[in-house]
Each structure stands twice: as structure tokens, then as C-alpha cells.
Amino acid sequence: MTRKTFTLFDPTLALPAIADAFRKLNPAVQWRNPVMFVVYVGSILTTILWVQALGGQGEAPAGFILAITIWLWFTVLFANFAEALAEGRSKAQAASLRGLKKETWAKKLAEPRFGAQWQMTPAADLRKGDVIVVQAQETIPADGEVIEGVASVDESAITGESAPVIRESGGDFSAVTGGTRVLSDWIVVRVTVNPGETFVDRMIAMVENAKRQKTPNEIALTILLVALTIVFLGVIVTLLPFSMFSVEVAGAGTPISITVLIALLVCLIPTTIAGLLSAIGVAGMSRMMQANVIATSGRAVEAAGDVDVLLMDKTGTITLGNRQASVFLPADGVSEAELADAAQLASLADETPEGRSIVVLAKQRFQLRERDIHALDAHFVHFSAHTRMSGVDMAGRQVRKGAADAIRKHVEALGGKFPASVSGYVDEVARRGSTPLVVADGTRVMGVIELKDIVKGGIKERFAELRKMGIKTVMVTGDNRVTAAAIAAEAGVDDFLSEATPEAKLALIRKYQAEGRLVAMTGDGTNDAPALAQADVAVAMNTGTQAAKEAGNMVDLDSNPTKLIEVVETGKQMLMTRGSLTTFSIANDIAKYFAIIPAAFVTTYPQLAALNVMGLASPASAILSAVIFNALIIVFLIPLALKGVKYRPLGAATLLRQNLAIYGLGGVIVPFIGIKLIDLAIAAVGLA
């Protein structure tokens, strides 16, 4: 997705949002927000009272009722505008995606190989399982998996990243997205989706989903706000008979008017957070989109904020991920050339970067030319997460390469023995933080290949920040325990899972969840799908398999596993924003008590004038100033709701103290200043 940024009140977003704010005045829309629905009903009632006042039957001056009515409607409109503006930012991002859905044609192959006959087919007619060829300067017509070839692909339309990426068969970079463009070479692609199910289609559906589901925390907060509203509604209902009784007993003043009661109710109920609550949720998803992460729901973003365990793959997240074969370490009685020959044979059909680096190293060290895999009449055994080894069966030979324990079991199952010298090499390589791969030819263990990887710069500091936030980091790797321990110590993670299988990952997630923790993880392979489906926050890589994307509740367009940390920070920022604005909204009430209560009852109880600490010009001015402030504060807080409260990697207790000081104390002080300034303005224009 092209990274187009918008200013907060960009005219291209603000003008449609204003129109949407009026459209949202539909009662069918308003009742979804119970607190703002009370304001909506109050606005209708004061409008009726104003019409009565025009006919000479008003309970208060028509001008006063009109002023209150206008600002009550503005309160509703400002809340609608905040939500519409947040939705507009997401819709603008969706519009750029819709531009990718142009009519394209595909070269559909009769057979799944390059060079086979093809026919031009509309992209809309492609079905899951069809095989197509895409050549230089052609647009990839549908989502799919590269099954042959390698090409440079421009994915800027989806990811916003201008640098082309390599997409090739095998490994973790085989997925391609419809709407991207091949810049050079060619690839044969197997289509993985039916029409209407493409990644772009799903992204558009996600960001344009009008009926956004409320998250559990949002529902809980809404219940609290509704409860407060009901309490204040009960208070307001009792004030009218209390006022009538007080006037009769005191023999002075006039009963409080319905208009003033409605104004008091609207000022006391938590309209600020109620008006911004939906906008905060939409903006959270929008911020994820700006980070090139598509969340399937606000629930996923919110869960990210509550996460306290991060499961991260070693390769690509903690290390650079470009492991390369660097050294052949032959077993006793085996020459280095023999080990290189066996390693190359076991890697001929291995399309992963590691497999190719073994073939290249054998060629560089011993001039072993890459052999024609078709001429060998061999059966290749591909790597799986369960066996944790790969290789070739040919001419009575079983050549395998893989993890030390997997090769040990394989050799012993065939009746062979695992040499102590090879175990020593495995431990030595592992202690260096490299990955040892053991090669065996039948029952004969040939030796060890060292795969070197490098821990990413700055990752240790990021993990230290997460630790301050109370988040536990766990590294997941297929490496043996010694290698995993060495890299874990270097990277600074709290724990690690070595020799990981899909079942082990799933069991670890369930263990943490049974302890009451929320778990986040990333994944890109089909073998990651069960764990992704179990995790509370599951970020699938865009380059990953279709199964991984469907199991996750977020998709990272940049396919950067380290993004998981940013996802968690964005989730925490959304929760902090909601909490901070709730605190501010409730703290606002103190100033409004001092403004409206004395104004409402001062004619009956003159002693209440002592509570007019702000020195407001008149009772009418005090009430109107409070109502105006109540409406305007929503507008002033829209930027904070959309941008989010500034997040710092601190402990929960420290963050709570800071936010209570800023938004709690600020919520008490700001209304006193705001209401007084509005009162001065009203007095200056002669409306007091």
C-alpha cells in the first residue's frame, strides 16, 4: 500500500467527514453509542422547547434555549465528526488499494512448468490451483505461490517500499500478491485464491467494514459510561421535584427549567470519551495500517496492547536471517571433499537460501559442479518441520542433512552409530552461535556444515525496553539447545524454545495462556498455522503461505518479523489513549459542578453564590459556557484520539502515575480555565 500521509484535518478528509457527521444523525446510527444517544435525545427535546418558546409558552427565554440547543447539536455533530474523520483515514487507504484492482490478463499454462503452452485468460476467471507464468514488466494477476523460477518484483503498490524484492520458489519468499509487477526474469505461479478472495480484496473489506465490532475492553468501558449516565440521569430526574420543593419552602426563586436540567445532564455524563471512543478504536487500526500491518479487527489491536509474552522466531527476527554455509567439518575417516560432495547432493533440490549456499560452497571449495537433478534419477526428500532433515535417495544411497538429533535418530534407525567427534563439532559450532547441520550417507555420518548467522544490531536494547514494560520475550528456533542458548544470551531474550516443532510451539503457547498470559507471535509457514491460530495476537508475514495468513489476525505487508514489537507498542498506545481520555472526561465534571449547580439554584439559595469560584458573569452565562466547553473539548481532543497518547517503554505503575498527573489533574484544571474564557467571550459580546 502506497504510504500516503494525511494531516489531521486534511480538506480531502475533513470535508467528507463533515458530510458524514450529518448523515450519522440518523437515529439508527446514534443509538449504537448510548451516551451520545442521550445527548441526541436531549438536543431534540431542547429544540421542541425552543419552538414552544417562540410561541410564547417557553419556560426560559427563547434566545437562551436556542443557544443551548445549538451547542447540544454541535456536541453530537463533533462526536460524529471525530468518528467519521477516523473512518475517512482508513477509507483513503482503502481507495489506494482499490486502484490496484484493474483489469489484467493472465498467461494460463496447460502444464505446471515454464515453456508449456499458455493462453490469455482474464484475471477474474482464474481459480485456485490454476498455474500461470508471469514475465518481465507484467503484472501478477492473482495471489499465488512461486513454484518455479526467480524474479525481481515491485511490491511498492502494496507495501510502499520502492526497492524491488526477490520472489523465488522454495523458502520463505515464494508468496506473490496480485497487483504487484515483475521487473525482471520470470516466475511460474500457482494461484492460491478464488476471485474476490485475493489479499487486496480482503484488505479493502477489512478497512471498509462499516459495522466495526467493539472490542471487549471497549464494551466494558461502554458499560461503565452507560452506568455513569444512568446514575446522572437519576440525579437529574430528582432535581426537578427537589427544586420545586425548595422554592416552595424558601419562598424565593423559580424552579429549575427543563432546558437547564438537560444542559446539566449533558455536561455531567462522560460525553468526551463517549464521543471519541469509536474514533480511538478506528484510529488504532489506521495506525496499524500506516505501519503496513493489516489487522482483521480492533480486537486484535487491543489484544496487542495487553500482550505480556512475545514468541519470536530466531531467523529474521532476532538474527539477520541470511544463514550461509561457511565451513565443512568432516568426521574421522572422511575427507572434506567427500563431505562437500554428499552435502551438495543432499542440497540439489533444496530451494532455501541455506541449501543453495551449501551447493555454492561445495562448488567454490572443490569445483564440484551442480549436477542435473533430472539425470540423476533420484528421489529427493524435502525438509519438513517434523523430520527436520532433507536429502536424496539414489542408486542405493540415502544421503541426508539436518539437525544433529534428527540425523542421529535416522542413522541409529538404520543400524549405524553417531561418532563422538561429530558431537564435538556440533557443540563447538553451537557455542559459536552458528547452526550445525549434520550430513549422513546411509549409516555413515559424514560430518558437519556450519551455517553462520548474525544477531541484529540494537535488538538487545529493544528487548530491554520490553522487559521494562513487563513483557517476556521468548526466542523460538529449530536449532539445538546449545546454539539456542548462545544466541539467546547474545540477543538478551528472557527464555528460548530450542528444537521447536509445530507441536512444541502450540504447547508452549497453551502453557502461557493457562497461566493467564496473552501471547503474541509471528509466522510465515504452513507449519506455523496451528500456533498462529492459538496465539492471542498472530502476525502473519505477507510473503508467507496462505494457511499462515488465514490463521493470523494480522498481516504484515513488509514481512518484517521484528514488526511484532511495533504492533505491541501500537496496541498499548491505543489502550493508554482510551484510559487517558476516560480519566480526563470524568475529571472534567468537577469544574462543571462549580459552573452549573450554583447557577441553577442561586435564585433559591443565594448562599450558593460562594461556589461561583470562577466569577462567572451570570447564571445563564455559566450554564451556556459549560455546555460550549463540553462540545469544544471533543474537537480539541480529536488530534489526541487519532494520533494517540505518546507511548514510552515504562512499567505499568509508572505510566499510570504519569497519566493520572497529566490527564487526571489536567482534566480538573483545564475546564476551569476553558469555561472562564468562554464566559468572558460571552460577556464581551453582550450575551451574558
UniProtKB/Swiss-Prot annotation:
Top EC category: translocase
Coiled-coil region list: none
Subcellular location: Cell inner membrane
Major subcellular location class: membrane
PROSITE patterns recorded: ATPASE_E1_E2
Alphabetically ordered keywords of this record: ATP-binding, Cell inner membrane, Cell membrane, Ion transport, Magnesium, Membrane, Metal-binding, Nucleotide-binding, Phosphoprotein, Potassium, Potassium transport, Translocase, Transmembrane, Transmembrane helix, Transport
CDD domains given in the database record: P-type_ATPase_K (cd02078)
Subunit comment: The system is composed of three essential subunits: KdpA, KdpB and KdpC.
Protein name: Potassium-transporting ATPase ATP-binding subunit
Organism: Dechloromonas aromatica (strain RCB)
Gene name in the database record: kdpB
